[in-house]
Swiss-Prot record:
UniProt pathway: Cell wall biogenesis; peptidoglycan biosynthesis
Active site: 160, 232, 328
Biological process annotations from GO: cell division; cell wall organization; peptidoglycan biosynthetic process; regulation of cell shape
Protein localization: Cytoplasm
Tagged with keyword Kinase: no
Record InterPro entries: FAD-bd_PCMH, FAD-bd_PCMH-like_sf, FAD-bd_PCMH_sub1, FAD-bd_PCMH_sub2, MurB, MurB_C, MurB_C_sf, Oxid_FAD_bind_N
NCBIfam families noted in UniProt: murB, PRK00046.1
Domain of life: Bacteria
Gene field: murB
Source organism (scientific name): Bacteroides fragilis (strain ATCC 25285 / DSM 2151 / CCUG 4856 / JCM 11019 / LMG 10263 / NCTC 9343 / Onslow / VPI 2553 / EN-2)
E.C. code: 1.3.1.98
Protein name (database record): UDP-N-acetylenolpyruvoylglucosamine reductase
Top EC class of this enzyme: oxidoreductase
The protein's required cofactors: FAD
Described purpose of this protein according to its UniProt entry: Cell wall formation.
Amino acid sequence: MEQKYSLLSHNTFGIDVSAACFLEYASVDELRGLIGSGRVTSPYLHIGGGSNLLFTKDYEGTILHSRIGGVEVVAETDDDIVVRVGAGVVWDDFVDYCVQRHWHGVENLSLIPGEVGASAVQNIGAYGVEVKDLIVRVETLNIEGKEHVYDVTECGYSYRDSIFKRPENKSVFVTYVSFRLSKREHYTLDYGTIRRELEKYPGVTLDVVRRVIIAIREEKLPDPRVMGNAGSFFMNPIVGREQFEALQAEYPQMPFYEIDTDRVKIPAGWMIDQCGWKGKALGPAAVHDKQALVLVNRGGAKGADVIALSDAVRASVRAKFGIDIHPEVNFI
């Protein structure tokens, strides 16, 4: 237990704030003990790697952080394998663990920052893969010390969303996540960038795909250890067919991804770039010069600086395209 604990190393934006109280635990029993001791005082917030948070001020309450580790095989057939993973496991360590064992499914999610528990809360995704399609169940403990296991069908997954993000589930803490992975070769290589990079290699393997994904991400995205950021700051908007066709008529070069016959996803980064924001700064916060979807802390930025930039970018996109883009990052 730490009082007035600095959160600088617990948020990838590098915002220098503190928590009134900081508690870590390494098992479900430890978490239950903390709850039973009365040390988890309201307000409270459970964080993972802090890679999807923007702290706007000091947190006048209790921050909880899981250090539950371990990867355990709980079921296996000739075709697939189910693993139960502690919520405190670093996500990319888990991806590497799977790739080394030739388990297919998570390789496209390489180098995404954060921890396993948060992956299930946020429904992380990249390059045609969403974690909801791999999750089997999510184990939780609530603020009253009660355990509950959610089948994936109960998790309410949609684009970067789940029931765990709802205000009424703020008191539900993820402890373990189980994933089903394939033992058979199964790749998702539909994104053009991936296919182009794979041409540099003599063949496709899990290790090669992971290396390609890492190379693509490192080229586009700044290292938060060097320049504070939370990865993609905005969600890609999904619009109806009629609105999409009107936009396409005006901007025939606009990239897009078909969701279904009625809905189309438009890259927010492209729209931000078209508004002239790529590489531009507003005080100590800026739009990254290689990926307009990413907002960065150039040094010494406060949460309010990032929000001011976010608001300005959103206003520009709304004025030019008539589309509201929404932050993927959670403001605290």
